[in-house]
Amino acid sequence: MIFQSWISKSAVAATLVLLALNVAHAQPLKNEAAAASNEFTPEVGQAGKDVIWVPTAQTLVNKLLELAKVTPKDILYDLGSGDGRTVITAAKRGARAYGIEYNPDMVELSRRNAAKEGVSDKATFEKADIFESDFSNATVITLFLLPSLNEKLRPTLLNMKPGTRVAANSFDMGEWKPDQTARVEGDCQTWCTAYLWIVPAKVEGTWKTANGELTLKQEFQVISGTLRTGDKSLAISNGKLDGERISFAVGVAHYSGRVNGDSIEGISIAGTAKTPWNAKRGK
């Protein structure tokens, strides 16, 4: 689901013409059976709370879940779940999947779709506002929102457990650059880019190590800083966070490890020598 409701009428009209031509195959017109049963059938461009609805092509749904490496061990939340296809696809992969959707008709449609696909036991849909919902137990978040809404969600996402995967259709997170990007073709004609972010651990600050004081600066998943040993201060390079995993270099030594709250444990490699290292966050 994309597009804020305040976009000008002419811009919306032009956009809908384009979308109707390119995604009509993904959004069939009301058929006789639906009309006869009075079941709700969504239409491309229908108004929503913050956005209008445009379906995500199934090939892109598959790519989003592939990038996020969704397994039966995951808990997935789709923020603005529309007709439920992302949630249903995740449930088919064995994940516990939840859709948060403001439109009650779309929620009921999603529940019917889940029942038809035989995954009602794993796919749950709730009528709610994504900005007022608690999805803190998620291991995977998926979304299809404008950048302004993504950025509004960004602080909440960054406060989630390190290693949580965030997969988005076509729109980015501003200064928080994606860890992976992929494009799909096939049945996808518009909005065909998949982005993946991995929520990084919070490491900015001073850490005590056996080799001296490690001072880290953090900008999302990128880290910089210095290691001070005695009267020497050495800059770190190639600093990166991948969820709880941290890596950087100091001179010829390459450090890797896992962040666990206020401690880090790992291995440093210099030439052929491998040495365990650990750090404690300064108080």
What are these regions (language model features)?
Residues 25-74, 104-137:
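S-adenosyl-L-methionine
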Residues 83-95:
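Conserved SAM-binding loop of SAM-dependent methyltransferases across substrates and taxa
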Residues 96-101:
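Conserved SAM-binding motif I beta-strand of class I
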Residues 150-202:
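C-terminal substrate-binding/active-site "lid" region of AdoMet-derived donor-dependent transferases
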